[in-house]
């Protein structure tokens, strides 16, 4: 979500001087002409033609910086990052302070998830231009990616001192806060982006704000932002998921099911969503539908929540022996899952096998003596 706002103008494209035919020799005129042509073709995504123009420059002048940067930019825009790195490094071997080569090289390392290398290159860039907000935000983003959160936050705040309401800094601070579960702070940063852009805000800002409300359990407020996102993109997974989960949180299971099923129309083999839909059907007592969804999920791959759902249905339907067998099997595969012991103990209790329930919970507490839920249930059973 790092590019939530509209793509910024590429301010790092080399600006060519006006070259007069009276001032420069014919070869320089040709280089200037080919450079302008190459960058224009690059803007038009005519990559092969742009590359041809830049190579023609190298035929005239070996190691021309415009040509080498242009070839790097062409490869970078084609996502051929290692090839681009070769061109940028060659340029820097002759022109160590070339900002365009430094910026392109850093962006390549960023795209390859080599964030430490990207930071090193951007730091070299900042030696020549330490007020460049675009580069500073990129360094902050990279620090966030390598979990250098303190440095990242310092740089984002530095950007906001230089330019109030800089969208990239606000977005980055939102991510930092969200990652540290500081959802109110994240909501504040992302809401500021929304307030500044309103109807033109990127859809990812809308879903990010919605997700903050989900985490804060202010579900009704969350639905507003997820619905606005769906107005932009009716098939947006994050908006559909957010609405389904908000309605689940508001205990409006029928509405929740509506959105789970909309996701499944787009992605019918999503076992997580199949299980969520199964849970919703189980909650409203539609066990037949719930079984269908859980079974579909398990046919794709084992899902413990789907398996638990089937066991809970047996428990709710009074099929206690089957429920006990299911919970025992699950415990064998996941012996530290306290929820399974609670459900199994409740089954024993409903079967008038209170002693077995008590023994089960006592055995569990030998390994996890501080589990409050288990201790409370054990206390109730002993009364």
Enumerate the predicted regions with their spans.
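TPR-adjacent "capping" and linker segments in tetratricopeptide-repeat scaffold/adaptor proteins
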Residues: 14-33, 59, 197-201
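Helix-start (N-cap) detector for alpha-helical repeat units in TPR-like alpha-solenoids
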Residues: 31, 65-66, 99-100, 133-134, ...
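Canonical tetratricopeptide repeat
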Residues: 36, 70, 104, 138, ...
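Register position in tetratricopeptide repeats
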Residues: 43, 77, 111, 145, ...
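Structural marker of alpha-solenoid helical repeat scaffolds
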Residues: 60, 94, 128-129, 162, ...
């Amino acid at each position: 979500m790092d590019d939530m706002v509209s793509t910024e103008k590429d301010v790092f494209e080399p600006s060519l001087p006006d070259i007069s035919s009276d001032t420069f020799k014919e070869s320089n005129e040709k280089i200037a002409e080919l450079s302008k042509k190459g960058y224009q073709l690059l803007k038009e995504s005519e990559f092969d033609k742009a590359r041809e123009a830049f190579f023609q420059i190298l035929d005239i002048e070996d190691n021309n910086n415009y040509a080498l940067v242009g070839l790097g930019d062409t490869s970078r825009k084609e996502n051929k990052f290692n090839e681009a790195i070769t061109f940028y490094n060659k340029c820097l071997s002759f022109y160590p302070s070339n900002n365009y080569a430094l910026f392109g090289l850093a962006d390549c390392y960023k795209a390859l998830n080599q964030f430490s290398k990207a930071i090193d290159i951007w730091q070299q860039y900042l030696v020549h231009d330490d007020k460049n907000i675009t580069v500073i935000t990129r360094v902050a983003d990279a620090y966030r990616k390598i979990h250098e959160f303190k440095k990242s936050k310092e740089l984002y705040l530095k950007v906001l001192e230089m330019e109030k309401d800089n969208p990239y800094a606000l977005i980055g601070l939102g991510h930092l806060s969200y990652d540290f579960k500081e959802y109110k702070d994240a909501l504040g940063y992302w809401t500021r982006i929304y307030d500044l852009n309103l109807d033109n805000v990127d859809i990812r800002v809308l879903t990010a704000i919605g997700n903050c409300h989900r985490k804060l359990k202010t579900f009704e407020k969350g639905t507003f932002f997820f619905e606005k996102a769906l107005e932009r993109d009716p098939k947006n997974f994050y908006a559909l998921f957010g609405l389904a989960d908000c309605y689940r949180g508001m205990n409006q299971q029928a509405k929740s099911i509506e959105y789970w099923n909309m996701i499944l129309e787009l992605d019918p083999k999503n076992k997580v969503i199949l299980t969520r839909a199964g849970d919703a059907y189980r909650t409203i007592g539609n066990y037949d539908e719930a079984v269908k969804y859980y079974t579909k999920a398990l046919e794709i791959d084992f899902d413990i929540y789907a398996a638990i759902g089937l066991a809970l249905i047996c428990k709710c339907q009074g099929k206690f022996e089957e429920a006990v067998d299911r919970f025992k099997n699950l415990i064998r595969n996941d012996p530290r899952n306290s929820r399974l012991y609670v459900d199994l103990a409740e089954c024993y209790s409903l079967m008038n096998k209170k002693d077995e329930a008590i023994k089960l919970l006592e055995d569990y507490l030998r390994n996890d003596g501080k589990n409050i839920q288990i201790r409370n249930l054990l206390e109730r059973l002993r009364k």
